[in-house]
Design a protein with these regions (language model features):
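Active-site loop-to-helix "anion-binding N-cap" substructures in soluble metabolic enzymes
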Residues: 1-232, 238-305
């Protein structure tokens, strides 16, 4: 089948089987075109909870599918490609977290949503990149242990000087490697462009940005801005999607290394096989993890998503 024929068959099957397809913004344009909803990890899970579909296919990475299952326990949830994991989410395990918490008694533990469900069972609340500042501000705690990304944690801490922060030294392997030198090169090549950066980037990069925000925030800003050129400091799929959505504007990658191969694992054939029942992985979680991680995620929703 051609790409178009495969897309049409996927659209037919998802309707026939009453399945909702969710695609993270870092997926390919071809995958986004068959999705019912696109966005960031938390936004997709919220949409999954709202849909009337009996089943959900997550085109993203494992922690996203797990979050979706926790927020929609009555639905059947599949991860389209079972090999798609998030390196940052897998950097810290439970024994290491417990040891870290022992070093910081009296600290509230705040987990980035990019963590495993097992890890969330030991945390007080989780956050997204767009909600981290507001939730940490609202949290009834003066001391916060922020895991696993010190870049996002430092960005939050800089805006909340009244609170004391400690960090685990993990982070996104892609965003972490971008440097001030990359910014200098991109600015020199595109002097009229605005720089839009994800807070998973290092502080030396964030400090030079015209806008700092989540994937969804970056896309919304670029679409509304009067500027005509943008340097995109997050996963390079966003350059592709913004170029598709805003053909009258120009978008440039901040650095070629901002490509997440884990997010590129999911393909149209994966989704097709999932709908046929011959591929993908149905997500199941033990009852204690569903309950513990659910408490952590629900508190995030209560404090403002």
């Amino acid at each position: 089948m051609t790409t178009h024929e495969l897309q049409q068959e996927i659209l037919r099957l998802k309707k026939e089987k009453n399945v909702c397809i969710l695609a993270h913004a870092y997926q390919s344009q071809a995958v986004l075109e068959v999705a019912d909803y696109t966005g960031d990890s938390y936004g997709l899970s919220v949409q999954a909870a709202k849909t009337d579909a009996a089943g959900v296919i997550m085109c993203g990475v494992r922690f996203m599918a797990e979050t979706c299952k926790i927020l929609s326990p009555e639905k059947t949830v599949w991860l389209a490609n079972q090999m798609a994991g998030c390196p940052m989410a897998e950097q810290l395990d439970l024994p290491a977290l417990r040891a870290l918490k022992a070093q910081y008694p009296g600290y509230a533990t705040v987990a980035y949503i990019n963590t495993t469900s097992a890890l969330k069972t030991e945390c007080d609340v989780c956050v997204t990149s767009s909600s981290a500042v507001n939730i940490c501000r609202a949290l009834d705690a003066d001391k916060i242990l922020f895991i696993p990304d010190p870049n996002l944690g430092s960005y939050v801490a800089a805006q909340l000087p009244e609170k004391q922060f400690a960090f685990y030294h993990g982070g996104c392997p892609r965003h972490m490697v971008v440097s001030a030198a990359d910014v200098a090169r991109a600015r020199a090549a595109h002097p009229a462009a605005e720089l839009l950066v994800h807070p998973e980037c290092r502080a030396e990069v964030v400090a030079q940005a015209d806008y700092v925000g989540s994937t969804t925030g970056i896309m919304a800003y670029a679409k509304k801005s009067a500027a005509r050129e943008f340097i995109i400091g997050t996963e390079n799929s966003i350059v592709e999607h913004l170029s598709f959505d805003c053909p009258d504007k120009s978008f440039y990658p901040l650095a070629v290394q901002l490509t997440c191969m884990n997010m590129k694992l999911t393909t149209l054939p994966d989704i097709y096989r999932c709908l046929l029942g011959t591929g993908g992985e149905q997500i199941t979680l033990p009852a204690d993890i569903m309950a513990g991680a659910g408490r952590c995620i629900r508190r995030m929703v209560e404090l403002g998503g």
